[in-house]
Every structure is written in C-alpha cells, then in structure tokens.
C-alpha cells in the first residue's frame, strides 16, 4: 500500500546505496510503498494524471476491463505481472500506450496518464518509493524550455531510476570484488575463494541483467517505426522532431547502460584471470607435494634395502661372518652400495617420467627452446646423483649463501649493467 509521509522519508528507503536520492527526498514529503499480495482477478497500481498528481494509490482494476479499455491482449499483461518471477526487460509500443518492464518497474504510460504497478518484493517496493517521488516531480515540472511530451517525461523518469539502481549495484559489487581480489594477491585462502565465488555469481547476474537492458534499448533505436510510435500525442508536423527527441533520449541511456556492461564484463574477466592463476598455483603446489612424497618414498626404499642385509646377518644363526676380519666392513659396503643403487635407479625412473610430463605439457612437437626449458625444470626439481654431490660439496665449501653463476649468466649481468650505464 502507498502512504504519504508529510515530514522526512523513512530511513529504510536509504538502503543499498540510495543515499543520493534519499537526500533529496529528506527535504520534503515522500512515498513509502508496501508490497502487496498478488491477485488473479485484479491488478493493483498507482495512477498519475496529466499534472503529475497521484489520483489513485494501490488502486485495483479488473484485469479484463483494464485490458479492454487500453486495447491490450492477455499476453501483454503477463509482462506486467506483479509476481516475483523476473521477466526479460522490455519496452513494448502500442497504439495507445507504452508497456514498460524494467527490473522492478512495471508501468503503462499513456499520453496523459501513468500506471505504476505495485510489487510483491520489499526491496523493489523501497525502490518504487524513490521512483514515485521522481515521477511526480518530473511530470509536474514546467520550464521555459520547449515542452517535452508527457509520455517522454515519464519514460525518462523510469530510465533514470533504472540506471541509478544499476549504478548503485555495480559500485557495491565492484567494491566487494576488488577487496577480495586484492586480498588474494597477498594470500590464497579458502574463505576468500568462497567469497570470490559468491561475488562472481552476483556480478554475472548483474552483467546479464544490464546486457538485456542494453540490447533492448538497442533494438528500439534500430526500429524507426517504434521511435515514431512512442510519440503518443504528436503535434501536427512534428513527428520527425519528436522521433529524434526520443532517439536522443534512448541513446543517452543506452550509452550509460553499455558502460555498465563493459565495466562489469572487464571485472568478470579479471576474476576469471585470477581464478586461472589461483588454479595454476594450486596445481603447482599439489605437484610439489606429490614430488616430495615420491622422493621420501624413494629414500625410504633405499634405506630399507640398505638395512636388509645387516638384518639378515644380525640373526642368531651361525653365518661365520662374525669370525671374519672384513665381515663388518664388507656388509656395510654392500648395504650402502645396494641402497645407493636402488635410490639412484628410482630417481632415474622418476626423472624420465618427469621429463615426459614436462615435454608433453609444452606442445606435441617440442622445439629446442622447450627442450632446454624442460631440462632446467628437471635439474631443479629432480636433480641427478652427481648434481646432488656437487651441490653438497659447494654448500660445504662456499656456504649456501653464495649464488651459483656460470659464464653465460655473468655475461648477461654485465650486458644489463652496460646497457643501464649507456642510458
């Protein structure tokens, strides 16, 4: 139900970013819309006359007579249904009226009257309260400029309200997504990824919604017949001028809606890129853990093989080795060699498997550059026994803090220094 508040606006109208509109409303009287219960036999709407005054608040009309008086069909009323089911945005031009269905606004615009249908949603009711105030002010305004047609002023008020809602929602989503993306740059957390998924779904819904509105406005701009028919009260000889005025009006809000589409699409692309990078990092960490587990398993197997022979010799059975002078040394040497041999052979097999994996990840027919890159990755992740010995000796002799550089790296560093000096 619609009530007139004679003092300041209800604070609930200032929710979800309508602070700018509410600041205007706080200076004078405002509307407060309550959601209604749908009825299959009647339509409930608020009526504005040609002077912008409210002549009916939540007034109920029988559906059949409402359609018959305006030359509409039952299928036209489905687009203006007050149910919570969202319909594709549309502006349908009829001989005697214009049917508007944009987001939370469902209205019928005639040449001297506007019918704004009530809603069943509390959130949409708050937004309709802002529309009522703007619509009353716009329809009742009189200026020294050339008079704008009544139906065009009503349509402009509706488009302004729709674009304001889109702008508010996009700013909210952009802020939330930006915070999550900045946090993911510092640390990858499961809760942050869940928040990013939720915000991504909301942003995708906003993108689809704004895209449908933009395409609808584009279709209207492409149809000269609809532009001419949107002038419900044309003066003689001014049809072309009125059509041009409507075209300029729709084109202005088309560009604004297209801006929201482009910005939301760019933000969605950034989210997708971030998700791809996060997946790559998680895959790399998973592969590192698997490689570490394989290395631990190989070392454990080598240690087990090395202790197998001493375990046999340590049984309380006569084997005559304890009487030999070389028994202890021989068993120790054979065990160490067996353990190293098993470890080296397993690392060689792991290196071959890793080489095939890296080579296949580059391309079906890898070139010399890919082969060199694969070899570098193998030397870093799965070094050979000789490379391990060299690394251990270098660490013992020079210390771990000394970086290892070959001649090519030294020449490259000197080249960088000379280039910087010449600049």
Swiss-Prot record:
One of the protein's GO biological processes: mitochondrial magnesium ion transmembrane transport
Transmembrane segments: 289-309, 324-344
InterPro entries per record: MRS2-like (IPR039204)
Keywords from the named record: Ion transport, Magnesium, Membrane, Mitochondrion, Mitochondrion inner membrane, Transit peptide, Transmembrane, Transmembrane helix, Transport
Main location: mitochondrion
Chain segment of the transit peptide: 1-25
Entry's localization field: Mitochondrion inner membrane
GO terms, molecular function: cardiolipin binding; magnesium ion transmembrane transporter activity
Family according to the record: Belongs to the CorA metal ion transporter (MIT) (TC 1.A.35) family.
Function: High-conductance magnesium-selective channel that mediates the influx of magnesium into the mitochondrial matrix. Essential for the splicing of mRNA group II introns in mitochondria by affecting mitochondrial magnesium concentrations, which are critical for group II intron splicing. It also suppresses a variety of mitochondrial intron mutations and its absence may disturb the assembly of mitochondrial membrane complexes.
Quaternary organization: Homopentamer. Forms homooligomers. Interacts with MFM1.
Protein name as it appears in the record: Mitochondrial inner membrane magnesium transporter MRS2
């Amino acid at each position: 139900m619609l009530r007139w508040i004679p003092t300041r606006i209800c604070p609930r109208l200032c929710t979800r970013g309508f602070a700018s509109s509410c600041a205007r409303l706080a200076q004078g009287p405002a509307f407060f819309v309550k959601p209604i219960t749908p009825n299959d036999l009647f339509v409930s709407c608020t009526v504005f006359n040609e002077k912008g005054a409210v002549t009916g608040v939540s007034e109920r009309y029988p559906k059949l007579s409402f359609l018959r008086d305006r030359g509409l069909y039952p299928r036209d009323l489905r687009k203006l249904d007050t149910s919570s089911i969202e319909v594709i945005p549309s502006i349908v031009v009829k001989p005697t009226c214009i049917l508007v269905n944009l987001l939370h606004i469902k209205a019928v615009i005639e040449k001297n009257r506007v019918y704004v249908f009530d809603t069943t949603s509390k959130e949409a009711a708050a937004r309709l309260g802002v529309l009522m105030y703007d619509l009353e002010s716009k329809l009742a305004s009189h200026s020294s400029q050339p008079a704008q047609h009544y139906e065009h002023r009503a349509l402009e008020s509706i488009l302004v309200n729709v674009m304001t809602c889109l702008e508010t929602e996009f700013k909210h989503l952009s802020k939330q997504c930006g915070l999550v993306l900045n946090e993911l740059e510092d640390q990858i957390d499961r809760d942050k990824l869940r928040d990013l998924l939720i915000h991504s779904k909301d942003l995708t819904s906003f993108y689809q919604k704004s895209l449908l509105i933009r395409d609808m406005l584009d279709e209207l701009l492409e149809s000269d017949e609809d532009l001419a028919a949107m002038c419900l009260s044309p003066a003689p000889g001014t049809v072309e001028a009125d059509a041009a005025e409507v075209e300029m009006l729709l084109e202005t809000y088309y560009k604004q809606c297209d801006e929201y589409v482009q910005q939301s699409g760019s933000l969605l692309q950034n989210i997708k890129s971030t998700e791809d990078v996060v997946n790559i990092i998680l895959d790399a960490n998973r592969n590192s853990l698997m490689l570490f587990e394989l290395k631990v398993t190989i070392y454990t197997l080598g240690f087990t093989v090395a202790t197998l022979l001493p375990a046999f010799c340590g049984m309380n059975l006569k084997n005559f080795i304890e009487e030999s002078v070389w028994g202890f040394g021989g068993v120790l040497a054979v065990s160490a060699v067996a353990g190293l041999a098993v470890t080296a052979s397993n690392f060689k097999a792991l290196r071959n498997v890793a080489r095939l994996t890296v080579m296949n990840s580059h391309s079906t027919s890898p070139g010399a550059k890919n082969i060199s890159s694969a070899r570098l990755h193998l030397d870093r992740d799965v070094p050979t026994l000789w490379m391990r010995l060299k690394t251990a000796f270098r660490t013992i002799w020079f210390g771990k803090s000394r970086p290892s550089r070959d001649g090519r790296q030294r020449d490259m560093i000197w080249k960088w220094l000379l280039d910087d000096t010449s600049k």
